[in-house]
């Protein structure tokens, strides 16, 4: 089975392949732009994108919408994480949190899979925002996010370490387990 991952990020595709290759599923990157609506939840954004793409893409595909939710910022950047990263970056988040004691945050990933029907899979990892960027691995907000139970940021971890505990890794695992059961 071939499965398209609709994303412009090749790093996400490599991460996904690790979960699906053992199932005999070939994941390939499909660079197609789709509208990302302004909505209250990642689930709404992912669902809209999948339904829009279903009218334009042949065969099964999935997409991922993820967000960083910072408690002291009332969940900001949340559903606006991609836009916020492009405009103010992680330095902007650090600036907004200057002097703030509450550094609690979580990452959430929502995967929307379309095979003629919509299937949603989610993953979440709790943690906190570092006081300064650390590490050179990963992408996005990885240099400032420290997952619960660790003293290193995602950017200081190997790809394998991060994937084992990350929000996207958890959502991909849930999706792969579902696919394994439903491909029979």
Curated annotation (Swiss-Prot):
Cofactor: Mg(2+)
Residues at the catalytic site: 65 (proton acceptor)
GO cellular component entries: cytoplasm
Pfam families membership: Ham1p_like
GO molecular function: dITP diphosphatase activity; ITP diphosphatase activity; metal ion binding; nucleoside triphosphate diphosphatase activity; nucleotide binding; ribonucleoside triphosphate phosphatase activity; XTP diphosphatase activity
Gene3D superfamilies on file: 3.90.950.10
UniProt enzyme class: hydrolase
Catalysed transformations (reactions): XTP + H2O = XMP + diphosphate + H(+); dITP + H2O = dIMP + diphosphate + H(+); ITP + H2O = IMP + diphosphate + H(+)
SUPFAM superfamilies on file: ITPase-like
Enzyme nomenclature, EC number: 3.6.1.66
GO biological process: nucleoside triphosphate catabolic process; nucleotide metabolic process; purine nucleoside triphosphate catabolic process
Binding site for Mg(2+): 36, 65
UniProt entry keywords in alphabetical sequence: Hydrolase, Magnesium, Metal-binding, Nucleotide metabolism, Nucleotide-binding
NCBIfam families the UniProt entry points to: PRK14821.1, RdgB/HAM1 family non-canonical purine NTP pyrophosphatase
Subunit structure of this chain's protein: Homodimer.
Similarity comment text for this entry: Belongs to the HAM1 NTPase family.
Function: Pyrophosphatase that catalyzes the hydrolysis of nucleoside triphosphates to their monophosphate derivatives, with a high preference for the non-canonical purine nucleotides XTP (xanthosine triphosphate), dITP (deoxyinosine triphosphate) and ITP. Seems to function as a house-cleaning enzyme that removes non-canonical purine nucleotides from the nucleotide pool, thus preventing their incorporation into DNA/RNA and avoiding chromosomal lesions.
Protein's name according to its UniProt entry: dITP/XTP pyrophosphatase
Species name: Thermococcus kodakarensis (strain ATCC BAA-918 / JCM 12380 / KOD1)
Source taxonomy: Archaea, Methanobacteriati, Methanobacteriota, Thermococci, Thermococcales
């Amino acid at each position: 089975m071939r499965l398209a991952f609709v994303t412009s990020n090749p790093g996400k595709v490599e991460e996904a392949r690790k979960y699906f290759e053992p199932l005999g599923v070939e994941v390939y990157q499909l660079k197609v732009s789709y509208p990302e609506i302004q909505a209250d939840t990642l689930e709404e954004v992912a669902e809209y994108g999948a339904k829009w793409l279903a009218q334009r893409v042949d065969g099964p595909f999935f997409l991922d919408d993820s967000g960083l939710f910072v408690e002291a910022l009332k969940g900001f950047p949340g559903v606006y994480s991609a836009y916020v990263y492009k405009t103010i970056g992680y330095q902007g988040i650090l600036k907004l949190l200057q002097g703030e004691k509450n550094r609690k945050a979580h990452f959430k990933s929502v995967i929307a899979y379309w095979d003629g029907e919509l299937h949603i899979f989610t993953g979440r990892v709790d943690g906190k925002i570092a006081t300064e960027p650390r590490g050179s691995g990963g992408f996005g907000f990885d240099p400032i996010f420290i997952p619960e139970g660790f003293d290193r940021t995602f950017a200081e971890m190997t790809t394998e370490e991060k994937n084992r505990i990350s929000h996207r890794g958890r959502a991909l695992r849930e999706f792969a387990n579902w696919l394994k059961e439903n491909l029979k």
